[in-house]
Amino acid sequence: MERIVVTLGERSYPITIASGLFNEPASFLPLKSGEQVMLVTNETLAPLYLDKVRGVLEQAGVNVDSVILPDGEQYKSLAVLDTVFTALLQKPHGRDTTLVALGGGVVGDLTGFAAASYQRGVRFIQVPTTLLSQVDSSVGGKTAVNHPLGKNMIGAFYQPASVVVDLDCLKTLPPRELASGLAEVIKYGIILDGAFFNWLEEHLDALLRLDGPAMAYCIRRCCELKAEVVAADERETGLRALLNLGHTFGHAIEAEMGYGNWLHGEAVAAGMVMAARTSERLGQFSSAETQRIITLLKRAGLPVNGPREMSAQAYLPHMLRDKKVLAGEMRLILPLAIGKSEVRSGVSHELVLNAIADCQSA
């Protein structure tokens, strides 16, 4: 069992990583006997895990209600968020309730925002079931829903009480979702840890076949890196922005193509190549290092080009609504070397458009 602490003073919390955690009531601390829980999951995961998690919580004396949401990025919306509020109020659940997010990034982000908003804030626990949510979205307290004009535009910073990562969930993950998660894994190597990127080049095949020790190390290292960044910059005023490598471009793809048509990790993968090409055009990143990124992403089964039907010009309106924009100016996350990156302002739109065009499918 691996245990990592996100250090945020009184709001510090543990990330527990192991197989078989859904069989252990202690996995869901700080829940105690007699407490009330609203378990939030989706229609795909409910048949797989809802009864198991409900059973282990009830075994610990916890009173469990549940709400099952539709599955898909297109349902990460204010309308679906309202169904969670309605379920909470119908019971009713008070300020002493705990929301448990059992699912991937959509369930986790939406449930976290519900917890931040319901009666001005109730406790919640992240139980991520996808690789992407285990290594990234469940850690750090970013909660949100989408708006038709932009991804994650309505939300709050709100930290969970704990994160429970059961590696056994990956056994039911579709290959496309596994690849999507690997995009965020590869991101950590590019922005923060060149040695980890080297390790990924050597061990990617093991991750693709869900090798237990390799996957446990991979998730642990990603969570360590994210925990360090969040502890240093919880509200993304500086260092934490680096975690958005590829996201400014990627969010544009997701919004323009319709939420759910490109998985988040797929869009981020293409976006990371666009960021690398931008950095190349600025003369601060080598084409050889861009090729290393492209090769690793392709091996993971990820796209390295934007959608054929999306012109370079179509990216700009979305990118100018990005949450990192200050005073109307884009701030891009750009690699300087494998393992080192920067936040860069003042890049001309023409250069960015040319970098996007470099990455468009033929």
UniProtKB/Swiss-Prot annotation:
Catalyzes the conversion of 3-deoxy-D-arabino-heptulosonate 7-phosphate (DAHP) to dehydroquinate (DHQ). Its EC number is 4.2.3.4. NCBIfam families: aroB. Pfam families: DHQ_synthase, DHQS_C. It catalyses: 7-phospho-2-dehydro-3-deoxy-D-arabino-heptonate = 3-dehydroquinate + phosphate. Binds 1 divalent metal cation per subunit. Can use either Co(2+) or Zn(2+). Zn(2+) binds at E184, H247, H264. Keywords: Amino-acid biosynthesis, Aromatic amino acid biosynthesis, Cobalt, Cytoplasm, Lyase, Metal-binding, NAD, Nucleotide-binding, Zinc. This is 3-dehydroquinate synthase. It is found in: Cytoplasm. InterPro entries: Dehydroquinate_synthase, DHQ_synth_AroB, DHQ_synth_fam, DHQS/DOIS_N, DHQS_C.
